Amino acid sequence: MYSEKFSAQVRDVIEQARSANEDVQVIVRFQSAASQRSIARLAVGAGAIKVNQDFRLIPATAVTLKPSALDELTDAEDVAEIWLDEVVHILLDVSTPHIRAPQVWEQMHNDGEGVTICVVDTGIDATHPDFAGRVGLTADFSGKGSAADGNGHGTHVASTAAGTGAASGGKYVGVAPGATIMAAKALADNGSGRMSNVMAGLEWAAQNGADVLNLSLGSRGNSDGSDALSSMCNAIVDMGKIMVVAAGNSGPRQSTIGSPGAAEKVITVGASNDQDSVARFSSRGPTADGRVKPDLVAPGSKIVAARASGTSVGQVVDEYYTTASGTSMAAPHVAGLVALMLRADSGLGPMDIKKMLMATSVDINISENEQTEGDKFIMGDGRVDALTAVQYAQSGQQPPPHKPSLPVPSPPSPGPSPPIGCMAAPFRFLKLDRFLPME
């Protein structure tokens, strides 16, 4: 009889491993950090379990074990739960004019300077001109040995959040071009990796100065947000960090929010297109336990952003840029917007930011066959509006709790602008309809 400490998914994988005489990779959550240390030593001594990663923000350890060793773990009173160390994948897909970011740069002289965004992804091409002087700490958790991006997805995501557009003469500028970029390479150059690698990258970023963390990746299927990666994301929000996560590209089917998009405390972002409608590919809610997700949507159709040298993600524009679609591209729009909000008021907490973003979002169109009372499961509270959100952030006031409809209501008069230079160059994104699914 199997223990209630692990799910049917874990049971299925264990049975397959037994039949094939293969090891299994799982994440074990303990009742406390003390029990985590003692049982980890016991596991190593037994020889049937290899410890891959210990986590500090939650009492959990990623291990590789023989199926026969599960009895030892499940019988231990201090073991609370055993999760499968799943493989997660990048989530591949105009734009800032739609969310009114250029007005924030020009009218409020706010480009996100002083705020650090960490992209936990396939790494970054730190030599790209759009990141000159903007890349802070980098680290590798994929086993490659460096954070260099041999895939291109992480570079594109980082550019959307905070690229300067230098290689395009200011044409392709990220939402917060003054922000500092951190990069944690948690996914291999093939675009996939274990949950435990992503969790290690998140933990490193949270403990090394990241203000905003972006995850443009996820697992397949519908999640209830109780898995290992979602638990780590919630713990990081409890530290005071803002977590922005892509919803996934499994729409228009309902109940397609995977992990970590289903995590309760993160900002889960779906995608809109150039018609200001919800993109067909954008994953829909509810979560497996019936909660509303995504929280909101942002542009994610055919976004032009930085291309990592020698890579071919999306449709290549030129030596320095490529076009991609997906909620992967929507999430960094919001991560960049959060940086602008924190620049306006660094005292805002994660829930302040989330509530403000949702309350200032605007209604957009959805397809006729989805015009139901379940609209929140399609677009959350709507498409983000950068100008209104940042104006409220700077004013020190909370927006009204109800969701506004187009046109956007007038925000309060903002206070003094931070004394920084603004990005005066026009911002342009090209938009197409194709998206690259999770594969």
For every predicted segment, state its role.
Residues 212-214, 298, 343-439:
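C-terminal subdomain of the subtilisin-like protease fold in secreted/lumenal serine endopeptidases
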Residues 74-77, 83, 123, 128, ...:
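Sec/Tat-exported extracytoplasmic proteins
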Residues 35-37, 68, 164-168, 183-265, ...:
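Substrate-binding/access-modulating region of protease and related hydrolase catalytic domains
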Residues 105-137, 144-194, 208-211, 238, ...:
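Subtilisin-like serine protease catalytic core
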Residues 1-103, 117, 129, 423, ...:
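Autoinhibitory N-terminal propeptides
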Residues 26-29, 144-148, 187-191, 220, ...:
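Second-shell loop/turn segments in exported
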